Amino acid sequence: MYGIEYTTILIFLISIILLNYIVKSVTRIMDYIIYRFLLISVALFALTRAQNYGINLPITGSMDIVYANSTQEEIFLTSTLCLYYPTEASTQINDGEWKDSLSQMFLTKGWPTGSVYFKEYSSIVDFSVDPQLYCDYNLVLMKYDQNLELDMSELADLILNEWLCNPMDITLYYYQQSGESNKWISMGSSCTVKVCPLNTQTLGIGCQTTNVDSFEMVAENEKLAIVDVVDGINHKINLTTTTCTNRNCKKLGPRENVAVIQVGGSNVLDITADPTTNPQTERMMRVNWKKWWQVFYTIVDYINQIVQVMSKRSRSLNSAAFYYRV
């Protein structure tokens, strides 16, 4: 009799222990499932609701002025457009409200009032000294001038590409270019650049290092000069530092938030001759209208097609920066 009672009690205790183990196991499994579900839910919520901090940004190059991170909304609702035009345009139009009129026309194309900025420059040469492109999309209008064709080409090469630059101390050091993507960019009110290539003994090749007059002149009285010399050879450089700044730059690739629209001329400027320049005909365009109203009307009409061949950027160009990425 006592044996049966002891057996019953033992079975009862074992059942309680087993049930307790099962309950704890089920609890642990449920906790794991619940925590995993919550973790996945939070992660998905963050990905679908948070701002885009670079996942879909098409350009990895950067500049020294940061804009807000882009979102997944329509570009025309959150983007800014800068239109750079010569003084000649506003002089010819001669209407104090022409910008307001164009803003209303851009509104019909999906660009809200206040998202389009009109920026005037006096001449291509002056614009070359300090180009500053601050908007998400930048359209630079250049009136074709046969006498300024080379200046226009150099400016287009500068603003249609990204450049990583360092300052140069030409009084202390010799410099050499490491490859085709390496150029020297000079900017200022007057840049005359002379170079003297050196041999391995630092003696001048065809020039005297102590006689500046014997140096080869590669730019004269320019406001913007992109200098290319023979790679792998040290050069002694001479220029007037009071009126010109020289930088050692490397071309990184196309700056896809900038487009150049050439006004007039028989052909679109070709900057693809440089082997480091990717074909950029899509962002080099030409319109042949004699009147500036007609030019701006055409731009308004095709603005959305134009920006489709461009890419929005998170940073801007500011050539005034000392250590900068332009």
From Swiss-Prot:
InterPro entries: VP7 (IPR001963), VP7_1 (IPR042207), VP7_2 (IPR042210). Residues 165-167 are annotated as: CNP motif. GO terms for cellular component: host cell endoplasmic reticulum lumen; T=13 icosahedral viral capsid; viral outer capsid. Residues 1-50 form the signal peptide. Ca(2+) 2 binds at Q177, D228, V229, D231, D301. It is found in: Virion; Host endoplasmic reticulum lumen. Disulfide bonds join C82-C135, C165-C249, C191-C244, C196-C207. Glycans are attached at N69, N238. Pfam families: VP7. GO terms for molecular function: metal ion binding. Residues 253-255 are annotated as: GPR motif. Its main location: virion. Keywords: Calcium, Capsid protein, Disulfide bond, Glycoprotein, Host endoplasmic reticulum, Host-virus interaction, Metal-binding, Outer capsid protein, Signal, T=13 icosahedral capsid protein, Virion. Ca(2+) 1 binds at D95, G206, S214, E216. N-glycosylated. Homotrimer; disulfide-linked. 2 Ca(2+) ions bound at each subunit interface in the trimer hold the trimer together. Interacts with the intermediate capsid protein VP6. Interacts with the outer capsid protein VP5*. HAMAP family: Rota_VP7 (MF_04130), Rota_VP7_A (MF_04131). Calcium-binding protein that interacts with rotavirus cell receptors once the initial attachment by VP4 has been achieved. Rotavirus attachment and entry into the host cell probably involves multiple sequential contacts between the outer capsid proteins VP4 and VP7, and the cell receptors. Following entry into the host cell, low intracellular or intravesicular Ca(2+) concentration probably causes the calcium-stabilized VP7 trimers to dissociate from the virion. This step is probably necessary for the membrane-disrupting entry step and the release of VP4, which is locked onto the virion by VP7. Some rotavirus strains are neuraminidase-sensitive and require sialic acid to attach to the cell surface. Some rotavirus strains are integrin-dependent. Some rotavirus strains depend on ganglioside for their entry into the host cell. Hsp70 also seems to be involved in the entry of some strains. Belongs to the rotavirus VP7 family. This is Outer capsid glycoprotein VP7. The lineage of its organism: Viruses, Riboviria, Orthornavirae, Duplornaviricota, Resentoviricetes.
